[in-house]
Amino acid sequence: MSEVIVVTSGKGGVGKTTTSANIGCGLALEGKKVVLVDSDIGLRNLDVVMGLENRIVYDLVDVIEGTCRLKQALIKDKRYPGLFLLPAAQTRDKNAVSPEQMKKLCQNIKDMGFEYIIIDCPAGIEQGFKNAVAGADRAVVVTTPEVSAVRDADRIIGLLEANGISNPGLIVNRLRVDMVKRGDMMSVDDVKEILSVDVLGVVPDDEDVVITTNKGEPAVTEENSRAGRAYRNITLRLM
């Protein structure tokens, strides 16, 4: 059974791409066959977070336009058996792809026998969002415990429901317990109360994420990382 999971946020800079990479790696480490799809056309980043930027030959738009076969564009991550990346086009804009084409692409990936297709959704609610959610079976919404990020997440949850995707899982990213205790940061309960969705996981603010991301090695692979442990738990809950 194949499943397409879109990772979205509304607000940029909350850790959506990092979350996508960690979920994808986490699933692959559990023995699953996974494709990470970067749907942020014109602003691709997932390849850098995964440390695969030097191996790109073809991209998502090349596949859709028939310049290459899907199999040619998929980059196998040699560190994790069963993990592949389909990068976004860097020199095109989001209008190069339609929701129908994205839906067909997801089906074609499913037909190749992949168990999970993780789509890294661009920030915002325009064409890129519509494309990313078109083929999705369910959604993960990433937010940080800030008023502006939570408000944007609320808007995204409404738009997901309008697109037929209900009950998204919520990830609260970069939580600092010391700030919550001082009353300087929203608690997980505060966020949950506002958004009224199930919390899939809480990722603590952890400098390991910055270090591992810069190395192109997602935190989920780090045994002693607090964020890595959180991502491993999130992965198990998603399965």
Predicted regions and their residues:
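Conserved beta-strand scaffold positions in the cores of enzyme catalytic domains, especially
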Residues: 4, 85, 199-202
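Solvent-exposed alpha-helical segments within well-ordered globular domains of core cellular machineries
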Residues: 25, 58-62, 72, 100-107, ...
